[in-house]
Amino acid sequence: MPSFDTVCEASMVDVKHAVENTTKEITTRFDFKGTPAAIELKDKEITLTGDADFQLSQIEDILRNKLTKRSVDVRFLDKGEVQKIGGDKVKQVIKVRNGIETELAKKIQRLIKDSKIKVQAAIQESKLRVTGAKRDDLQAAMALIKKDITEVPLSFDNFRD
């Protein structure tokens, strides 16, 4: 029975390279000289550190540009709150989304059921598997998901006949 998986995964290698390039640019830019501006990647969290909110937004803009150059969708980034740390410093944690959240998976599953396309959707941990009798039905389900779900970058893999 033909099937495919719907996933939401960023290339962590490209994210790492974008963070490294952002670090290089921060160290060479004149407006960041003598400031504690920094960016750091640990697991799937990017930590921005700076003097003020304005500096954090500049670092974030640099990061977004570097990610875009590496073809990583910026919708993978989930911004956290700006926190004050010792002195005048502030930090912000940005999480890199990896996997489809349960709520979104249920929304996609409901969308497929309501569309009356003859396919079944099953939630499997951080991905959604869609199976159907015909390849055309699966392609129709893909088109429906691409059209209606825009808040996160979804991709399709593991297409089997």
Curated annotation (Swiss-Prot):
<dbReference type="Pfam" id="PF04461">
    <property type="entry name" value="DUF520"/>
</dbReference>
<keyword id="KW-0547">Nucleotide-binding</keyword>
<comment type="function">
    <text>Nucleotide-binding protein.</text>
</comment>
<dbReference type="InterPro" id="IPR007551">
    <property type="entry name" value="DUF520"/>
</dbReference>
<dbReference type="GO" id="GO:0005829">
    <property type="term" value="C:cytosol"/>
</dbReference>
<protein>
    <recommendedName>
        <fullName>Nucleotide-binding protein Rfer_2692</fullName>
    </recommendedName>
</protein>
<comment type="similarity">
    <text>Belongs to the YajQ family.</text>
</comment>
<dbReference type="InterPro" id="IPR036183">
    <property type="entry name" value="YajQ-like_sf"/>
</dbReference>
<dbReference type="InterPro" id="IPR035570">
    <property type="entry name" value="UPF0234_N"/>
</dbReference>
<dbReference type="GO" id="GO:0000166">
    <property type="term" value="F:nucleotide binding"/>
</dbReference>
